[in-house]
């Protein structure tokens, strides 16, 4: 293999690896921690005088991905207490009463039928702000989210 062809091959491989890495990082940036113990997660949120935000998501939901990527993941990385519960997911989780259940059972208990849905929980696992259902108004999603967080904080 000539030096020119070898250099061209390495250049193309580098571009491909760089693009793959950027794609993987953008996907990683759009994740939220899965709820595992709602009592513990709520306790931590309340210590910081903040409602616990629970995003109900569904695998493959484009609106969910957009809400995570544009708003929720950056907020969570900045310290806002946000966890995710997935519809149709049998992953175990402790509910607010400390009982073992699944993500899917929680979504049914909370009567969530639209994704994404954001719920804002305060003391005792009670909802302290109006739910945000859907993400079909992207220009207003951020202001609506900030309003719900303020509503939740006021109720604490």
Describe these PLM feature segments:
Residues 79-100:
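Thiol-based oxidoreductase modules, predominantly thioredoxin-like and allied folds used
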Residues 104, 108-119:
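Structural micro-motif
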Residues 25-42:
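N-terminal "domain-start" segment that seeds a small globular fold
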Residues 1-17:
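N-terminal secretory signal peptides and thylakoid transit peptides that target proteins
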């Amino acid at each position: 293999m000539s030096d020119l062809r070898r250099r061209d091959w390495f250049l193309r491989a580098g571009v491909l690896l760089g693009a793959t890495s950027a794609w993987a990082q953008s996907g990683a940036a759009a994740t939220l921690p899965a709820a595992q113990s709602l009592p513990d997660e709520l306790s931590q949120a309340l210590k910081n005088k903040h409602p616990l935000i629970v995003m109900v998501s569904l695998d493959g939901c484009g609106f969910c991905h957009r809400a995570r990527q544009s708003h929720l993941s950056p907020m969570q990385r900045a310290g806002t207490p946000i966890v995710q519960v997935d519809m149709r997911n049998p992953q175990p989780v402790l509910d607010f009463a400390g009982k073992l259940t699944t993500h899917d059972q929680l979504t049914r208990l909370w009567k969530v039928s639209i994704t994404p849905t954001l719920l804002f929980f305060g003391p005792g696992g009670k909802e302290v702000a109006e739910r945000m259902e859907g993400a079909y108004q992207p220009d207003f999603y951020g202001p609506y989210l900030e309003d719900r967080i303020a509503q939740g904080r006021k109720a604490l």
